[in-house]
C-alpha cells in the first residue's frame, strides 16, 4: 500500500494555502499513476470532522484509490463509524486509525476498540501520535489490539512517530506481537519528527522479496534533493521534548520554524501548559 495524502474538506481548508495532496482529487492521483496497473494498492487518509466524505470520497468503482484510512480521536468514534460504513459501502478497504491513544483513558480506548470491532472496518491502527510511547508500552497495547482483532476478524497496523528516536523500535516491537501492517516513510519523512524509516524497516525484515537497491536509489534521486531544497523533518530536540511530555508537536513545529535554540526556555514553557 502507498498513501497519497489526505481527503480534506475544501470548505475547511483553503486550496490556495495547501498542496494538492491535502485533497487528493481523483484527477491529480491519476495524473501520477494512471489506472495504477501495478500490484501496489493506493490509500488516502480521511480525518473525522475534516472531510466531506459523502461528497469527496466517490464510489470505489470510479476511483483508483483502494483504501480509505479513517483517522479519529476516541471521543469522535460515532462519527468515525459513520465514515467507515460509508467508505465500506462504496467498495473500499477501510482502516480505523485511533489517534493520540497515549492521552486517552484505558476505558475509552477499550470502548472505541469494541465499536470498531463491531464495524465493517478491515483493520485497526495503533497510532503513537505524539511519539511518546516506549517499546514495552507498545508491547501491551499491541497485545490488546491483536486480541480484539482476533475476536472480530480485523488485522492490526502500527503508525509511529519518531520524537524520541523510537519509531523504528516501536514498529518492530509491534510486528513481533503480531501487528501486520507497518507504516513507514522514505528517510522517515513526516510531520515534525517524522515516522519509521522505510530503509530501516526493510533492512530489519530481511525478506528476500524486498530489494533495498531501488530504495537507496530513490533516496539518492529524490529524498536528498528534497532535504537540500529546505524541506524540514526528522528528530530534533524540540520534538523530543514534546514527545517526552506526551504533547502534540505543534509547539515544537513553531519553535523550529522560528529557528530558535533556547531549549531550556522552551521546555519550561511546555511544562507550564
Locations of the language-model features?
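Catalytic cores and adjacent flexible loops of soluble metabolic enzymes
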Residues: 1-273
Amino acid at each position: 500500500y502507498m498513501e497519497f495524502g489526505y481527503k480534506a474538506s475544501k470548505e475547511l481548508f483553503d486550496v490556495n494555502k495547501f498542496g494538492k495532496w491535502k485533497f487528493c482529487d481523483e484527477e491529480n492521483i491519476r495524473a501520477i499513476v494512471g489506472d495504477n496497473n501495478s500490484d501496489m494498492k493506493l490509500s488516502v487518509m480521511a480525518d473525522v470532522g475534516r472531510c466531506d466524505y459523502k461528497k469527496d470520497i466517490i464510489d470505489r468503482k470510479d476511483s483508483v484509490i483502494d483504501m480509505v484510512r479513517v483517522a479519529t480521536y476516541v471521543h469522535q468514534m460515532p462519527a468515525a463509524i459513520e465514515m467507515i460504513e460509508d467508505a465500506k459501502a462504496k467498495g473500499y478497504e477501510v482502516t480505523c486509525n485511533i489517534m493520540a491513544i497515549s492521552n486517552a483513558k484505558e476505558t475509552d480506548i477499550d470502548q472505541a476498540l469494541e465499536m470498531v470491532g463491531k464495524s465493517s472496518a478491515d483493520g485497526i491502527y495503533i497510532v503513537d501520535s505524539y511519539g511518546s510511547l516506549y517499546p514495552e508500552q507498545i508491547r501491551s497495547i499491541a497485545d490488546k489490539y491483536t486480541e480484539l482483532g482476533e475476536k472480530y476478524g480485523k488485522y492490526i497496523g502500527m503508525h509511529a512517530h519518531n520524537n524520541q528516536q523510537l519509531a523504528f523500535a516501536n514498529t518492530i516491537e509491534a510486528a513481533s506481537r503480531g501487528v501486520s501492517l507497518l507504516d513507514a516513510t522514505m528517510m522517515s519523512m513526516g510531520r515534525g519528527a517524522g515516522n519509521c524509516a522505510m530503509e530501516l524497516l526493510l533492512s530489519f525484515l530481511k525478506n528476500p522479496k524486498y530489494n533495498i537497491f531501488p530504495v537507496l536509489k530513490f533516496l539518492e534521486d529524490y529524498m536528498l534533493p528534497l532535504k537540500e531544497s529546505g524541506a524540514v523533518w526528522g528528530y530534533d530536540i524540540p520534538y523530543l521534548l514534546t514527545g517526552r511530555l506526551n504533547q502534540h508537536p505543534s509547539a515544537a513545529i513553531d519553535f523550529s520554524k522560528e529557528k530558535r535554540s533556547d531549549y531550556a526556555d522552551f521546555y519550561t514553557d511546555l511544562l507550564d501548559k
